[in-house]
């Protein structure tokens, strides 16, 4: 009997020693693996210099939020300026190095060489369709031409504000404007827009829906027209479809990185009286028309005062911002 008890005690002692040895071996192996992995991670981190990304956080706010004026002294060292001008300007200047000359003059005002971009456009229509407002600050020179006051005024309303637009199919649907910020924008080489307001029975009010000659004309042979009709009333529309397009748009707010300089004209065109234009700092100004060199010299001289009433934006804006923006 004593032999059996000694054997049992000896078995448990051997088992305990064996288990202890196995556990110590496992711990040593785990320590070795952990130390190795830690060492590899540290070495790779030093060598890779990678960005550390955290968890995915929800994005709040809108890119179209109207930012406070961010222009500060010496801010131009890391800002870009786009200057837009009609094609008649370089034709009159007739100097192949005129842009280099202006770049050197802008340098004296704190704008480094390479930060100012010169962009030419042929006419109001071309610019309104595809403005390419890509810079931190965008200054547009518009030559005042008698007879085109309305096109210029509406171009100013278009590019000084953000618009959200959708195409309109006027052959299939009636349309109504839902508020003061809701407008119809037509563009083309010659836009004539006619409307017929409808009652609740879809019968014309003062017009016949089957006879476009009875429709009211709201735009006649214009390149750019921003149409405003009575809100909450359906309208049947008719346009010169071969030379014109029309879109249903909502004005979202001011596009604060754009300023317009009217060149010539007895009075400056004013769009701030529009009830859809929120109170804002005037970003449309006028300079006297003499010669294009004189105009550009004036712009260079006052460029820093001009951008002080603007706000730098962090993204590019082009025609998509008021056509199919989402």
From Swiss-Prot:
Subunit-level organization: Homotrimer; disulfide-linked. 2 Ca(2+) ions bound at each subunit interface in the trimer hold the trimer together. Interacts with the intermediate capsid protein VP6. Interacts with the outer capsid protein VP5*.
A Pfam family assignment: VP7
Disulfide bonds: 82-135, 165-249, 191-244, 196-207
Residues of the signal peptide: 1-50
Any Gene Ontology CC annotation: viral outer capsid
InterPro entries associated with the record: VP7 (IPR001963), VP7_1 (IPR042207), VP7_2 (IPR042210)
Residues annotated as binding Ca(2+) 2: 177, 228-229, 231, 301
Family to which the UniProt record says this protein belongs: Belongs to the rotavirus VP7 family.
Main location: virion
Keywords: Calcium, Capsid protein, Disulfide bond, Glycoprotein, Host endoplasmic reticulum, Host-virus interaction, Metal-binding, Outer capsid protein, Signal, T=13 icosahedral capsid protein, Virion
UniProt superkingdom: Viruses
Residues the record lists as binding Ca(2+) 1: 95, 206, 214, 216
Sequence segments annotated as region (CNP motif): 165-167
PTM description: N-glycosylated.
GO MF: metal ion binding
Protein name per Swiss-Prot or TrEMBL: Outer capsid glycoprotein VP7
Summary of the function given for this chain in its UniProt record: Calcium-binding protein that interacts with rotavirus cell receptors once the initial attachment by VP4 has been achieved. Rotavirus attachment and entry into the host cell probably involves multiple sequential contacts between the outer capsid proteins VP4 and VP7, and the cell receptors. Following entry into the host cell, low intracellular or intravesicular Ca(2+) concentration probably causes the calcium-stabilized VP7 trimers to dissociate from the virion. This step is probably necessary for the membrane-disrupting entry step and the release of VP4, which is locked onto the virion by VP7.
Organism this protein belongs to: Rotavirus A (strain RVA/Human/United Kingdom/ST3/1975/G4P2A[6])
Keyword Calcium applies: yes
Glycosylation sites: 69, 238
């Amino acid at each position: 009997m004593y032999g059996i008890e000694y054997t049992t005690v000896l078995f448990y002692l051997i088992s305990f020693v064996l288990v202890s040895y196995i556990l110590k071996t496992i711990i040593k192996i785990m320590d070795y693996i952990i130390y190795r992995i830690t060492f590899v991670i540290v070495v790779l981190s030093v060598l890779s210099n990678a960005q550390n990304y955290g968890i995915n956080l929800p994005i709040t706010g809108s890119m179209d939020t109207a930012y406070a004026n961010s222009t500060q002294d010496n801010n131009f060292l890391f800002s870009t300026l786009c200057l837009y001008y009609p094609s008649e300007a370089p034709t009159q200047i007739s100097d192949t190095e005129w842009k280099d000359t202006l770049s050197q003059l802008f340098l004296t005002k704190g704008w480094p060489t390479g930060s100012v971009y010169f962009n030419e456009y042929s006419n109001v229509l071309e610019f309104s369709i595809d403005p390419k407002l890509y810079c931190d600050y965008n200054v547009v020179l518009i030559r005042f031409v008698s007879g085109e006051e309305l096109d210029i005024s509406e171009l100013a309303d278009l590019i000084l504000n953000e618009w959200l637009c959708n195409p309109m199919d006027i052959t299939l649907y009636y349309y109504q404007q839902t508020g003061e910020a809701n407008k119809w924008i037509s563009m083309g080489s010659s836009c004539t827009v006619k409307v017929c307001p409808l009652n609740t029975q879809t019968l014309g009010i003062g017009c016949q829906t089957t006879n476009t000659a009875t429709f009211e004309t709201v735009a006649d042979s214009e390149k750019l027209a921003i149409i405003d009709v009575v809100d909450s009333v359906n309208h049947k529309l008719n346009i010169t479809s071969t030379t014109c397009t029309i879109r249903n748009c909502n004005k979202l707010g001011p596009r604060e990185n754009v300023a317009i300089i009217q060149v010539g004209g007895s009075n400056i065109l004013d769009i701030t009286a529009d009830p859809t234009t929120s109170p804002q700092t005037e970003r449309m100004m006028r300079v006297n028309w003499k010669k294009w060199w004189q105009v550009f010299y004036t712009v260079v001289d006052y460029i820093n005062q001009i951008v002080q009433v603007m706000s730098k934006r962090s993204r590019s804006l082009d025609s998509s911002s008021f056509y199919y923006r989402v």
